[in-house]
Amino acid sequence: MKQLTILGSTGSIGNSTLSVVRANPELFKVTALVAGRNVREMAQQCLEFSPRYAAMSDEHSAKSLRLLLAEQGSDTEVYSGETAACELAALDDVDQVMAAIVGIAGLPSTLAAIRAGKQVLLANKESLITCGKLFMDEVKRSRAQLLPIDSEHNAIFQSLPERIQRQLGYSSLNENGVSRIILTGSGGPFRETPLSQFSDVTPDQACAHPNWSMGRKISVDSATMMNKGLEYVEARWLFNASAEQIEVVLHPQSVIHSMVRYHDGSILAQMGTPDMRTPIAHAMAYPMRVSSGVAPLDFCKVGALTFTTPDYQRYPCLKLAIDACNAGQAATTALNAANEISVMAFLDSKIRFTDIEVINRTVVEGLLLSEPTSVEEVLVIDRKARDVAAQVIAKLNN
């Protein structure tokens, strides 16, 4: 039985992970849960899964959780803060860590799991976007096992040779017969919306993804295709790929989650119903296969599968992310930080949908930054980019 710590248990990925645990109680045991401030949901999770430990992001939330659990007779030990999250990610008796805290806030605990040599199920893409080389160097040094959770990266992982799977981030694609990685994306809810209407898009409209059930931040990223741009950056690091070895293709049905093209002309694709429980179950049980609770794909109901080239006029954030990736780690760190601030401002109805790209571009092009050589330097770049993004938003609102 695998002992599991879930970082970000009350989020979308965290809940899907617990759903897989629920479907396979003989295979997985939850040892620790880590979340932000959603006390009531964390209390429900603790009562159902009886983890030994739980941690909230602040002491006020932790105190509220302790009171709720005490009323129910739970003996789960409750802690708070980043240090606690890092300690629970590195527990000696934990085999597997789901790294699903959204944003750069998830970086310290994800790194703690890596440094402890755990099997890390990576849903926190910001770890690679901001700390790609530093992160992969830690993976190699600690001999941790990295398994991607994003549906696209998990699909690529499943379609690659076992030799690359075992040496993720360091094997040569070319030497293993791989010609190119094909990253698919649905195009989001505004794939056919006239560009003239983009400035009037509301947060609720942006969060209404046609295929996937996701959190609000990642739903907006999908609408701008910034999510695909960040996945492009992540794929470059995860699979040791050059710019020439990755292409992005729009696939509105979200049935093929990504593909790998080989030198002999073959293309291997991973297909399935668009449900995050599938890649989560794959990574949790790897190299075995277990039930995810997802309904099987019915090809007769799916009908046609279509593909198109992304339009950068419609999706300028995608192009911005690809350009930032080619510029270096400082640029992708700044872009990620700016995007977190701009998306939050949009969700709070402080800016227009079209302002997201303007803010992101202004930050990336306006900051003169040297390449980071440590996590501390990455965090400095992150803070600078957030400050500049906030300043740009303030100017837009004046």
Curated annotation (Swiss-Prot):
Keyword entries, A-Z: Isoprene biosynthesis, Manganese, Metal-binding, NADP, Oxidoreductase
Catalytic activity of the protein: 2-C-methyl-D-erythritol 4-phosphate + NADP(+) = 1-deoxy-D-xylulose 5-phosphate + NADPH + H(+)
Gene3D superfamilies the UniProt entry points to: 1.10.1740.10, NAD(P)-binding Rossmann-like Domain
Regions annotated as coiled coil: none
InterPro entries attached to this UniProt entry: DXP_reductoisomerase, DXP_reductoisomerase_C, DXP_reductoisomerase_N, DXPR_C, DXPR_C_sf, NAD(P)-bd_dom_sf
Record-listed NADPH binding positions: T10, G11, S12, I13, G36, R37, N38, N124, E126, G215
E.C. code: 1.1.1.267
Domain of life: Bacteria
Pfam families recorded: DXP_redisom_C, DXP_reductoisom, DXPR_C
Enzyme superclass (EC): oxidoreductase
Binding site residues for Mn(2+): D150, E152, E231
Pathway annotation: Isoprenoid biosynthesis; isopentenyl diphosphate biosynthesis via DXP pathway; isopentenyl diphosphate from 1-deoxy-D-xylulose 5-phosphate: step 1/6
One of the protein's GO biological processes: isopentenyl diphosphate biosynthetic process, methylerythritol 4-phosphate pathway involved in terpenoid biosynthetic process
Residues that, per the record, bind 1-deoxy-D-xylulose 5-phosphate: K125, S151, E152, S186, H209, S222, N227, K228, E231
GO molecular function: 1-deoxy-D-xylulose-5-phosphate reductoisomerase activity; manganese ion binding; NADPH binding
Needed cofactors: Mg(2+); Mn(2+)
Matches recorded under SUPFAM superfamilies: 1-deoxy-D-xylulose-5-phosphate reductoisomerase, C-terminal domain, Glyceraldehyde-3-phosphate dehydrogenase-like, C-terminal domain, NAD(P)-binding Rossmann-fold domains
Task of the protein: Catalyzes the NADPH-dependent rearrangement and reduction of 1-deoxy-D-xylulose-5-phosphate (DXP) to 2-C-methyl-D-erythritol 4-phosphate (MEP).
HAMAP family: DXP_reductoisom
Family under the similarity heading: Belongs to the DXR family.
Subunit structure: Homodimer.
Annotated protein name in UniProt: 1-deoxy-D-xylulose 5-phosphate reductoisomerase
Organism: Yersinia pseudotuberculosis serotype IB (strain PB1/+)
Protein's gene: dxr
